[in-house]
Amino acid sequence: MTVRVGVIGTGMIGQDHIRRLTRVVTGAEIVAVTDIDADRAASVAGGVGARTMPSGADVIGSADVDAVLVTSWGPTHAEHVLAAIEAGKAVFCEKPLATEVEDCLRIVEAESARGKRLVQVGFMRRYDAGYREMKELVDAGGIGTPLMAHCVHRNPTVPETYHSAMAAQDTAVHEIDTLRWLLDDEIVSAQVIRPRRTSKRFEHLQDPQIMLFETESGARIDVEVFVNCQYGYDIQCEVVGESGTVRLPDPARTGLPSAGSVRAAITQDWKQRFADAFDAELQSWVDSVAHGAAGGPSAWDGYAATAICGATVEALHSGQVVPVALKDRPGLYGGNNQ
């Protein structure tokens, strides 16, 4: 079966996903595209032999669209995902599932009412080979009961439009989802520490930040977010257990011998660092649509991430430990291991 995909949003990530679906992933075809920038949509559609449509509603309602890819502006996600659920169509939604917790819950409730999973959220790190190796070891009991996790998320620079809350909402959201999945544990509180600010930042920005989380089991997670580190895109993760530790392996790098030493280039952005994970993520989605059973990060995971990010932003502003109070998980959604 070839999955016929309609795409809502042809910005940078939308174009990246369209390229993957047409050049890397097997079993998919782009048939319809829409964007608020009609000229851009037409240009992208022409490159893959798809047609343009006036709106997301038109894409979702099209009889020849089997599944929907939502890569539009974050505040529009809920509208499109809810429409896809109502139409009974599988939908891949880039993070965030929705920018507001209430909208995430509407999506969870709508999907639960249908009694079938249709939504997959774009948390690509679950498909990264290094993280998957860590997950296998943790699940197998290789380090004993997890006690702590240490994470680092560094970017070389960010644009002036990046503000302090985005350290949680756009950056650490990946660590938040990954650690929920990696530990199969729920985060119950958030705290943010403000270290000395780097001089390599815009005046309005608190950078770096250290985020502290506690899980239901009592495990502790610390996440360093430093988005103006200058030297490269650096992702680190270590889980400490009762009988051992497991660390995210560094990506393969080509060594450059020079002046008595060997230098290795450092990845400069997320697109390069997680290229293989993005490929695997979309292949998994297409395969699941073809087999009629959604997998991967769920609407519940999207809701939890948005709620935890909200608590983290509150903690940043208040300086307090902020509890995370999630609703009861509907029966449609299992644990964090999907």
Swiss-Prot record:
Keyword match Disulfide bond: no
Keyword field contains Oxidoreductase: yes
A Pfam family this chain is assigned to: GFO_IDH_MocA
Gene Ontology biological process terms, A to Z: inositol catabolic process
Entry keywords, A to Z: NAD, Oxidoreductase
EC number(s) per entry: 1.1.1.18
Reactions listed under catalytic activity: myo-inositol + NAD(+) = scyllo-inosose + NADH + H(+)
MF term (GO), any: inositol 2-dehydrogenase (NAD+) activity
Superkingdom per UniProt: Bacteria
Alphabetized PANTHER family for the sequence: INOSITOL 2-DEHYDROGENASE, PTHR43593
HAMAP family assigned: IolG (MF_01671)
Family in the record: Belongs to the Gfo/Idh/MocA family.
SUBUNIT field: Homotetramer.
Job of this protein: Involved in the oxidation of myo-inositol (MI) to 2-keto-myo-inositol (2KMI or 2-inosose).
Protein name (Swiss-Prot/TrEMBL): Inositol 2-dehydrogenase 3
Source species: Saccharopolyspora erythraea (strain ATCC 11635 / DSM 40517 / JCM 4748 / NBRC 13426 / NCIMB 8594 / NRRL 2338)
